[in-house]
Amino acid sequence: MYLPRDWEPGDAYPLIIEYPGNIFFTPSCYSTGLPDQCAIGYGMTKGTGAIWVSLPFIDRAAGTIAENGWGNPADTADYAVDVVEQMGDSFGGDRRNVVLTGFSRGAIACGFIGLRNDRIASLWQAFHLCQHFDGDGWRGATMESAIGRAGRFRGVSVFHTDNSEEKVRPVTEAMNVPTTFVQSGLGAHSTAMFLDDRDSTKALRRWFIDVTGGDDQ
């Protein structure tokens, strides 16, 4: 959990929930598969104006955090609901202003976990997905099932970084909300683009302000 630099007790703040990618190693990126490596939430806000929480994929029965795969999807979804409630109760997280984001596995999880049932689907004001999407076929995230999940989305907007508009179109049409696509130009499977001020990251920050009603920092 990251409280913004301008956090004050008693105030309300938009809430960013972020899921990490899998564990993997490439010359350009070492992904641990753990939530402490998440970076998108910081890139969205530069550390001000919103609470940012990175979540694990969990299996309660095994007592483990899944570095690869979903863990237990039902447990992972229930944990997210509990965290959003806790952030609202204890830290001023605005339950009407929650943005779900993720990279790679985490991007798929926006739909596969975040729209798993009506209870969790009701949380989200908006989605941001980076370099993958629900419906690309990974670990049960088929296009047919993703379209079904997309019908549960009750938010107002979706933003994609480094995804193909054509490939995502069936899910986009099912969600039926304004959707933005940008290309970062990073040329690597990584979240490094969110740590600088390239055009795609600045566009994401403007979008976040628009969907949450925040102030430009």
Can you describe what each PLM-predicted range is?
Residues 10-13, 70-78, 104, 118, ...:
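Soluble non-cytosolic domains of exported or imported proteins
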Residues 15, 19-82:
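Active-site machinery of serine-nucleophile hydrolases
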Residues 1-15, 50, 170-178, 214-217:
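A domain-start/cap signature at the N-terminus of enzymes
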Residues 107-119:
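Short glycine-enriched nucleophile-adjacent loop
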Residues 8-12, 43-48, 93, 119-122, ...:
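Extracellular/periplasmic catalytic domains that process cell-envelope and extracellular macromolecules
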Residues 5-11, 65-104:
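Gly/Ser-rich "nucleophile elbow"/oxyanion-hole loop immediately N-terminal to the catalytic nucleophile
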Residues 15-19, 51-56, 97-102, 110, ...:
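Structural recognition of the beta-strand scaffold that forms the well-ordered cores
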Residues 119-208:
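The feature captures the conserved acid-bearing segment of alpha/beta-hydrolase catalytic domains
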